């Protein structure tokens, strides 16, 4: 959530900055009207409180003199009733302002390129050279069928479209990938591993920005005979980041770096007809998430570090990729700056997103009231939060199957994964 004081004092300027966000126009008139109502009711509340306090003192003095105070008491009671009414009106207006503020995206950083969609993203660099095959390249679906490791028909039978069953050595590689990523991030990059719930409450989803705006992208669950509604996590970013909700952290304990391997669940609303073949876009997929909680002045530096750590996974797997700086029209709702890492997919002859690394600035921290305080300082300040995929396990599996395929349909196991697969070098029929 944007700083309400900043929004209040610089409404036109912020509205102009947010125009570059795809599909968003800040309703300046509505916000201005609500602000005027807030100011009027705030002044009225303070005036009534002052008058009531003054009248109460008058009652005390009159009572001490033995005077009749019944009329004064009636006036104070009337003021109290009026004050309660005004307070209720003020609370309603403040709720409206907050609900409006919760739908406003983050302000892009100055260095973020202007643009409408992904065609305006800026390529930063490419790493590795796509392999040239001397045989006809198969996609991961065909390779999975040859090896008996990807069963999309079973996924449809069990659950429906955009689900799959992964079996045998392909399932083993899928597990090996997650273990390799976790070991890299915990042993070399300084992250602490976390195991978190896959079901979260609405307060948690508000904290990281999925609600109220993106409820249709979630799977919601309401157990029988239970009033509590949950949602399946769309990413481990949600529970991991919320671990600092309502906390005041000693600045000496920052940065906090956490990683988690979880399944992720997304309804893929609005993506009908896109990537209907294979593992690229699923309702359920695994991901290793990276989260950092940092001091405000260090968040841009932390974004570079976090992105480099996600890149290291691709480099160790020797998978060609490119790094892209997202434009204003393609960034996520809560991000101020985002890098995407796109891995080479031979059968599609293109790069596809495998990681998105974002600096959320104080956007999530304000929603969560996650703060830090320096030693000896009474004042607190909001932390900055960052997150990124390190990496999406299913898409990494896709990239390995296609980039490491052989003419007979077998798959060469990347060297760094072999210790996790009992030394297996080739996955064959």
From Swiss-Prot:
Which positions bind ATP? 266-268, 353-356
The UniProt catalytic activity note for this protein reads:
tRNA(Ser) + L-serine + ATP = L-seryl-tRNA(Ser) + AMP + diphosphate + H(+); tRNA(Sec) + L-serine + ATP = L-seryl-tRNA(Sec) + AMP + diphosphate + H(+)
GO terms, biological process: selenocysteine biosynthetic process; seryl-tRNA aminoacylation
What residues bind L-serine, as annotated? Answer: 235-237, 289, 389
* Record-linked PROSITE patterns: AA_TRNA_LIGASE_II
Give EC number(s), comma-separated: 6.1.1.11
Where does this protein reside within or beyond the cell? Cytoplasm
Subunit structure of this entry? Homodimer. The tRNA molecule binds across the dimer.
The UniProt family comment states: Belongs to the class-II aminoacyl-tRNA synthetase family. Type-1 seryl-tRNA synthetase subfamily.
Which PANTHER family does this chain map to? SERINE--TRNA LIGASE, SERYL-TRNA SYNTHETASE
Q: Tell me what this protein is called.
A: Serine--tRNA ligase
Which taxonomic lineage does the organism of this UniProt entry have? Bacteria, Pseudomonadati, Pseudomonadota, Gammaproteobacteria, Pasteurellales
């Amino acid at each position: 959530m944007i700083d309400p004081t900043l929004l209040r004092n610089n409404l036109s300027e912020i509205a102009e900055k947010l125009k570059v966000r795809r599909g968003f126009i800040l309703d300046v008139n509505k916000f201005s009207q609500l602000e005027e109502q807030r100011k009027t009711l705030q002044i009225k509340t303070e005036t009534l409180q002052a008058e009531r306090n003054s009248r109460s003192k008058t009652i005390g003095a009159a009572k001490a003199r033995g005077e009749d105070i019944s009329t004064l008491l009636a006036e104070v009671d009337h003021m109290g009733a009026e004050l309660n009414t005004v307070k209720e009106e003020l609370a309603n207006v403040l709720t409206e302002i907050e609900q409006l503020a919760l739908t406003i995206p983050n302000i892009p950083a100055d260095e973020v390129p202007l643009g409408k969609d992904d065609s305006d993203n800026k390529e930063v660099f490419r790493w590795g050279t796509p392999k040239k095959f001397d045989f006809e390249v198969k996609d991961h679906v065909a390779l999975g069928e040859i090896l008996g490791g990807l069963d999309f028909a079973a996924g449809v039978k069990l659950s429906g479209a955009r689900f799959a069953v992964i079996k045998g050595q392909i399932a083993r590689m899928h597990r090996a990938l997650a273990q390799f990523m976790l070991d890299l991030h915990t042993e070399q990059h300084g992250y602490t591993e976390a195991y978190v719930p896959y079901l979260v409450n609405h307060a948690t989803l508000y904290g990281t920005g999925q609600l109220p705006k993106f409820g249709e992208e979630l799977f919601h669950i309401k157990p029988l005979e239970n009033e509590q509604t949950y949602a399946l996590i769309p990413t481990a970013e949600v529970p991991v980041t919320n671990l600092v909700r309502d906390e005041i952290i000693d600045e000496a304990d920052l940065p906090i770096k956490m990683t988690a391997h979880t399944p992720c669940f997304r309804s893929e609303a609005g993506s009908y007809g896109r990537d209907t073949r294979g593992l690229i876009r699923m309702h359920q997929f695994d991901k290793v998430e990276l989260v950092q909680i940092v001091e405000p002045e260090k968040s841009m530096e932390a974004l570079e570090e976090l992105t480099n750590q996600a890149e290291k996974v691709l480099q160790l797997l020797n998978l060609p990729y490119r790094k892209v700086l997202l434009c204003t029209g393609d960034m996520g709702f809560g991000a101020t700056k985002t890098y995407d890492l796109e891995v080479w997919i031979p059968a599609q002859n293109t790069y596809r997103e495998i990681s998105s690394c974002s600096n959320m600035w104080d956007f999530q921290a304000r929603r969560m009231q996650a703060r830090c305080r320096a030693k000896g300082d009474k004042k607190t300040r909001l932390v900055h939060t960052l997150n990124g995929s390190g990496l999406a396990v299913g898409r990494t599996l896709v990239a390995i199957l296609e980039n490491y395929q052989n003419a007979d349909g077998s798959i060469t196991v990347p060297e760094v994964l072999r210790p996790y697969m009992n030394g297996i070098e080739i996955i064959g029929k």
